[in-house]
């Protein structure tokens, strides 16, 4: 008899086809996340769970899952999962690193360009008919933005995605500085990046892009103090986690001109609505689509499947997050 898995959202079919060879699948087909009560009910009878970042896997849920042995997260980040509690209960937790690196780096750079060159603002100007009404065909001062060549890009968090972004920026002639918990000498040499402390990065960067996980240490690491250290022409990009930035402080900074603009793909609460933020023209917003390419999402589905299949075969999943679990619950 196959073990049971509950998948909390429709993932690409390539992953489903791989998983169904080893598991009995129950799939939540509604695009909205399953209600809390439904999720608590479903986990009671399953051996495996496939989750998204919007699924809260806390102590309460784990207490309701006596048979649960593995949680396969369909994402790189896993701040929605109580890793410590899962490990205590001998539950494996896996993620999907690597396959979404290029997609997320592409989006970060797209946001950077969109804000710097005021692309969304210009698009709205044309579509709304305002350009026609203005009777100004072309003007030397129309929609002036910022060029990239020779500018400094500060990258906070220099893992796979941060390094991929740096390589793209190099092609635009940008100078790269970075701050990370640990220095990356090999990457510094390969890419031509310079390690600096956090305060120096904030003060010297023309563009700042965030690529850190959400932890107690990174929560609101960009707040009023940090925003005031940045250049008045600086642009902030966030494709990591929304709570890394204090939203209220950012709104104040954008309104009062402490910084020039921002590009956000993530928010403190998702789905997100803030009328005050939405009125600002110097911010470009996206609905958490960092990995939203066919290639990345299919690659993530394949990794989820590989992690589940390895576990079903009595092997260590290739992307095991909580390796301490092997001490109490070896495969």
UniProtKB/Swiss-Prot annotation:
* Noted pH dependence of activity: Optimum pH is 6.5.
Lipoprotein is among the record's keywords: no
Q: Catalyses which reaction?
A: glycolate + NAD(+) = glyoxylate + NADH + H(+)
Keyword annotations for this protein, in alphabetical order, are:
Cytoplasm, NAD, Oxidoreductase
- Record's Gene Ontology CC terms? cytosol
* Residues annotated as the enzyme's active site: 241, 270, 288
* Lineage summary: Archaea, Methanobacteriati, Methanobacteriota, Thermococci, Thermococcales
Enzyme class, one word?
oxidoreductase
For whether the record's keyword set contains Transmembrane, the answer is no
Query: What protein am I looking at?
Result: Glyoxylate reductase
Please state the protein's primary subcellular location: cytoplasm
Q: Where in the cell is it found?
A: Cytoplasm
Subunit text: Homodimer.
UniProt similarity note: Belongs to the D-isomer specific 2-hydroxyacid dehydrogenase family. GyaR subfamily.
Q: Which of this chain's residues are annotated to bind NADP(+)?
A: 158-161, 180-182, 239-241, 288-290
**What do we know about this protein's activity with respect to temperature?**
Optimum temperature is 90 degrees Celsius. Extremely thermostable.
Q: Which Pfam families match?
A: 2-Hacid_dh, 2-Hacid_dh_C
List the InterPro entries. D-isomer_2-hydroxyacid_DH (IPR050223), D-isomer_2_OHA_DH_cat_dom (IPR006139), D-isomer_DH_CS (IPR029753), D-isomer_DH_CS1 (IPR029752), D-isomer_DH_NAD-bd (IPR006140), Glyoxylate_reductase_GyaR (IPR023519), NAD(P)-bd_dom_sf (IPR036291)
Q: State one molecular function term (GO).
A: NAD binding
- Disulfide-bonded cysteine pairs: these are none
What Enzyme Commission number(s) does the record list for this chain?
1.1.1.26
> What PROSITE patterns does the record point to?
D_2_HYDROXYACID_DH_1, D_2_HYDROXYACID_DH_2, D_2_HYDROXYACID_DH_3
